[in-house]
Design a protein with these regions (language model features):
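Conserved Rossmann-like nucleotide-cofactor binding loop
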Residues: 42, 181-183
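Residue-level signal for beta-strand positions within conserved beta-sheet cores that form or flank
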Residues: 42, 71, 325
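Conserved phosphate-binding/catalytic loops in two-lobed NTP-binding clefts
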Residues: 138-153, 313-337
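Nucleotide/phosphate-binding catalytic cleft detector across ATP-hydrolyzing
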Residues: 1-39, 47-58, 63-175, 188-311, ...
Length: 389
């Protein structure tokens, strides 16, 4: 579950006649160390955070809310390594994560909670699930493995600050999270994420070396180039002109979704989730870009990393100027790290209720799914659970 409230402190609560409830560690408040690990189609990185949770209300059964978030360490950003077109180099990713733990001064035993996510085109690789499951077990005590385009969109909206912006200004914000393999969209209304969607468009669908020789091509990259009338092959050179055409074409498709529901057959084919329903740009007060390509949209980074990121950033800026609504663009709190911040800082809630476990040594249990059981009149809990499962 995500925590959808602002960072805030609760006032001291009076109980009875003049008694004041203090912040007692473990009773009224506690702190957790959290990790967010993002293994993406373009880049991989992680963030360690410290979360402070305080109890809501005077009752000991009141639930805890995250009231403070503090980033303790940000790793470097590594280009996700591949052994082939279908395999991520798990050994190199392991070394990178382990070195980041050492550099931060943490061991897995120090980490209380967090999430490991694998995103975009990386999610389609043959060894994607074993990688996520390995890091979920290696990284700390209670780490969840999260994946899925809608969930990633949600995390990015929280991590980049779009949700906080929407809530603070009571406005509708569109978050566009642009990665290497996919772009995620979140519509945030008055601080609530009301719709999410994703499309198979990203800056690293085609990767190339310093001389322009193609080193990797994703299926969506081939499809897009074919629409432009070009073929692309690993080991063959791609010209700068074709790179620019490719980047501009992807930006055009993205802005089809920014302005309305997808209308072209190509955009519909590239969707990896259902699109927004009953959506028009006229609803939106602000647009916030996040993800790796956002660093180029806001011109924070002009470096090419063997993909069309800088060209795509320029094309996005050009399309923004053509929109009928002006002054929509706002800056994110986090750009390339939006999803990993969301994973590390917005994936925890704590209940104030207690549960009895006869053998606590069985914990932690990994990979448990959350289900919603709807109870009808006179229906047994067992029947409701069986139906939900």
């Amino acid at each position: 579950l995500h925590d959808d409230d602002f960072e805030h402190d609760h006032p001291e609560l009076e109980i009875g006649s003049g008694a004041v409830l203090e912040d007692i560690e473990g009773l009224e408040m506690f702190t957790l160390k959290s990790v967010g690990i993002d293994i993406g189609s373009s880049t991989s990185h992680l963030v360690f955070s410290q979360l402070t949770l305080r109890r809501e209300g005077a009752s000991l059964s009141g639930r805890f809310r995250v009231t403070e978030r503090k980033v303790l360490y940000r790793s470097g950003i590594m280009l996700t390594p591949y052994l082939s077109g279908t395999l991520i180099d798990i050994d190199r990713v392991k070394r990178f994560i382990e070195e980041a733990y050492k550099e931060a001064g943490f061991s897995p035993e120090d980490i209380d909670t967090g999430a490991v996510i694998i995103t975009g085109e990386a999610l389609k690789k043959e060894n994607a699930r074993p990688i996520v499951e390995y890091f979920a077990k290696y990284s700390g005590k209670f780490i969840c493995a999260a994946a899925g385009h809608n969930h990633e969109a949600l995390l990015a909206a929280y991590g980049c600050g779009a949700v906080d912006l929407s809530k603070a200004e009571r406005k509708t914000v569109l978050n566009v999270d642009m990665g290497g393999g996919t772009t995620k969209f979140s519509l945030v209304e008055n601080g609530v994420v009301t719709q999410t969607a994703a499309i198979n468009v990203g800056a690293r669908l085609i990767a190339f070396d310093d001389s322009g020789v193609v080193t990797r091509v994703e299926d969506a990259g081939r499809t897009l180039m074919q629409e432009l009338g070009y073929t692309v092959e690993i080991g063959k050179k791609i010209t700068k002109k074709r790179m620019e055409e490719f980047a501009a074409f992807m930006a055009k498709i993205l802005f089809e979704l920014v302005e309305r529901e997808p209308s072209s057959s190509l955009a519909k084919r590239l969707m990896v989730t259902p699109p927004f329903a009953n959506y028009r740009l006229s609803q939106v007060d602000h647009i916030v870009f996040s993800g790796g390509v956002s660093e180029h949209v806001y011109e924070r980074d002009r470096t090419s990393y063997g993909d069309v990121g800088p060209m795509m950033g320029k094309s996005v800026r050009d399309y923004l100027k053509k929109l009928p609504k002006k002054r929509l663009l706002r800056e994110p709190l986090e750009g390339i790290r939006a999803t990993v911040i969301g994973a590390g800082e917005y994936t925890v809630q704590a209940s104030g209720n207690t549960s009895y476990i006869s053998n606590p040594k069985v914990l932690p249990v990994f990979g448990l799914k959350v289900i919603r059981a709807s109870l009808g009149p006179g229906q047994s809990i067992i029947d409701a659970l069986n139906r939900s499962l």
